[in-house]
Amino acid sequence: MVNARSRSPASAGRRWGARVLLGALLAFPLAANPPLATPDRRHVKNAWEIRNEITVPPSSEMEVKDYFLSFRDYQELVLYDSKAGYYSSGRVNFVQDYFTFPNTLAPLFEQMVAVQVFKMWDGMRRAGTLGPRDRFTIAEFGGGNGEMARSILGFLNEAQQKDSSGAWLELWQQVLYVSYDRSPAMVAEQRVRNSPAGGKFEVREGDATNPASLIAAGSIKGVILSNEMLDNFCVHKVVLSLDGSAEVAFVAPTLPPALWSRLEKRAPESLRRLIESDDRIIRDRFFHDEPAGARWLSRASFVALLEWLASLPDYPSLVNSILFHEIYVPARAIPELADHLRRYARPYACELAKLGRDVVTYISLDEGKFMEGIGRILKAGYVLTIDYGSNWEGILAPAPYSHLRSYGPGHRRSDPYRDAGLNDITTDVNFSVVAAEGRSVGLNTAFYGRQRELQAGTPIKLNELPPDQLVDAHARQYNTWLEYFKGSQAFKLLVQQKENTDAAYAYPDLHRVPLDVDEAGLRPPVRNRAAEIEKKLSAAVALASR
């Protein structure tokens, strides 16, 4: 029997199919599937984030990855699939779906960034790290609609025309703004929006999780910039427990009988055969005691179905009729995740011990890949990261809301399975991991704190909106967003400096936030519990390398 816990609600070149593998696996003898008890999740602090959990026999847990998408792969699909993905399909709307500060506080938000960039350039120049003939590159990853680039370049151009000292002119002569985005639709929009900048702006299509594949090693002197980009990295959904176990979520979609009856009459024959075939394979492997009716979707059949549905006018109603289940298996099923948990077992254990409860958390492995790539391409300069997130304590402490959110036209929710392919899905950034991964590749933390500290050391007066924007539609809400900018605890600023930059510049030493776990502040019982959890967690995930 399938046990449901509750009733609550890619990169383009990726090959999702696994037909041959499914058939090969089916050749092995099948074990009986007795009715399974529903996992006891009462000790999970934020158990409401677990959606329609079902179980498989322990002997089959390691096979789940061969049939179903991990939660991370599901997120990758619905955001970036070339036909069904929210970003790649061009459905994204930066005004209706959500607001970002480069839009709501434009152009003053970008002007603060521009002044910080000027100070970094000036510090490198005075220290001799940047020569007068060197190019100074502003490389933005996840440029979205290109508003950040447009406003920054506009400010730099205006400043060099007004400045009598000649410094801004020197920067303008050296600067090149290069934007990278994985969405072809966003690349096209940026190119049009920034066409007035001429040769000062370039936009290129590329995946930010692998910067070293886009840019030659050691070729950049300047600033690596991102605003609300890391939060879009796809994440593994993980349950961390006080007993030291770690479980990762896989997504098992099903077509209820009524929905399959509708789709069967309309779907292409090849898709019908794929769904029927993989449903039989999945039932035989995991759920052969289940009554027939609903159709189980494998990784391959779900992707094929979603891409076909995306072409239909009634896509929203159809995709919302799919029932999504989650299957949790030991995290060692994904070796890269197991390696991450092993390397960061200590801080995870400390925060679990402080909480005294199991917890659902979201882990991005791409944060580390991004920082590794940035460390390789940046010869000298800075990394300026603006995003919402927290340190170890904040990222594991369950808030009244989920650390994962979904944004679409006129709404925000925490259900990633609603309106699949029609919404953005974002997750709070673990800045402690970003900083640690940066240090490992020569990027030292110069500042970490609240986003409002971006204004530090700049002459920008946020209370003085430019006269030409007083009649703009967003200007009427400007003060509301300004107060949010000043008071928000969620948005953070991380400034990192590449080693050997030796710039005559330091970020203002203001209200810094700690990045590491304060182990000295732990009470002895909590410290002992943390040591025990760390030992068990390290042992559990170490099995992945055997």
Q: Language-model segments: what does each one mean?
A:
Residues 223-340, 400-407:
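A mobile, often basic/glycine-rich helix-loop segment
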Residues 1-43:
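N-terminal mitochondrial targeting presequence
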Residues 36-141, 145-221, 238, 467-469, ...:
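Rossmann-like AdoMet
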Residues 313-546:
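Long, Lys/Arg- and hydrophobic-enriched amphipathic alpha-helices
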Residues 150, 234-236, 395-396:
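Short glycine-/acidic-enriched loop or helix-start segments at secondary-structure transitions
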Residues 143, 229, 386-389:
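Short, well-ordered beta-to-alpha junction loops that form the rim of enzyme active sites
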Residues 211-232, 362-376:
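Conserved adenosine/adenylate-binding substructure
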